[in-house]
Amino acid sequence: MLTILQANPATRRRYLALRVALLVHIVLALSLVCLAQTEQTPASSKPADGKPLTSDERAELLKLIKSLQERVDKLEAAQATQAPTTQTPATSLAPQSETKYDPSTSDDPHVWMEPVVKEKPVSEAPAAASYGRYTPNLGYKLANTEYGDMSVSIYTYARYLNQLGLASNYTDSFGNVKSVQERQDFQLQKVQIKFLGWVLDPKLRYFLYTWTSNATQGQGAQVVVAGNVGYTFNSHLTLAAGITSLPGVRSTEGNFPFWLSVDSRHIADEFFRPSYTSGVWVKGNVTKRIRYQVMLGNNMSTLGVSASRLDNKFNTLSSALVWAPTGEYGQGFGDFDDHQTLTSRLGVHFTRSDENKESQPNSDNFENTQLRLSDGTVIFTPDLFAPGVTITDATYRMMDIDGGLKYRGLAIEGEYYWRWLNNFKFLTEPTQLQRQQVPQSLFDHGFQLQASAMIVPKTMQFYVGTSRINGQYGKPWDIRSGVNWFPWKNKVVRWNNEWLYLYKSPVGYSSVPFALGGKGSVFHSTLELAF
């Protein structure tokens, strides 16, 4: 009985109609019995009004009622067994869906931080196909409703690093001898947990993450909890705010982790590039083949820097304009996608920022960048150019041009950088003699060049690369060679082995395989998981 009462409205209406019909049937039966008894009474007998029924009459009525009750019980039992069957189609039907843009098919390098919105349910009714769906590098679908969706994605890698081939010390351009740490260790290097999706409207998207670098245990920015939120008005304009990388070079456009090496740049790219900061930005397509991104931020690197250490100028500006003549270039470096026709790209980047000594991060924090001379010395170092002279402020300007070609698993990609540092301010006003020892401006330029080939399509990739910095205080360079194995023929799991040779590296910290001032060979082997 409870099952029937809990059924849907249509079932309850059928049940009530059945009960009414049975009651009418009982009343008619009783009337027929009484009529039959009346007809059997002799004509000379007195009316039976007011007399109780005889024992035979009562027995006949009870027998009839019992028979009707048994029929009611059987009908109720049959109705109860049919109720779940009638409800099954209603619960098993998936909600209608509206096809949405799938960013995993885009050549936009920012798609790794965009949610997958393949289907938008019309109702909140459960749909098995909407939950647990997996999209490589964009994770598993946790929720999918008409009011929003959420996916979870994890990126991590374990690395063996051997720097024993490096010289134990180096001499900077000012004659100072400094030591080089020669590491050999194994680290679960980085763990990133990402939550991404949309809320209320598929155009309103969020990207939240926790990010840790275990090699920098104890550092101020060893663990980062960050993210951003944006609204896409159309294909030409997305407005967003939060923490992201300044798009000053190709590797900071948003294509991480789709690099040839695992989470490791060439030293020239590391030397010139900006880093992550808080701010606002716009991006979109100018045409189908030209896209742009412009960001206004706090400083060049916010990791490990509190708001109390920032200046109040809010004048860090970075931009990227990318042209793909064929309309599609693909994510990241190398031709894993095996383009069957020649595809190319050309990018132009520009960044400027007024930097202050207080707004600079600690030098060993991961993913940070600092203003350095080409020998690796931070320009805010006290007494750097002359005794008693300390630079506290400087203006950073950097222009970058990159280009690339891809064809049938082969790729060649290069980048050139120009950087200017000027508008120096000092802790104390230098004397005329001291000013003669301090350069009015600094100019450095350099390049990186990488070539790669898919030896076995979707499985084995070989690459080589080199970079060089032409600076006023040194001309460091590096070369590297490596191989990537993709055992499942996708970018979810990768085993990378790489050898590199450093010559007076001007950059380096515990999160990367190269060391500051390093000269010599380095080997590292890395197992990467990105789902």
Language model features: what each stretch is:
Residues 19-31:
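Bacterial N-terminal signal peptides
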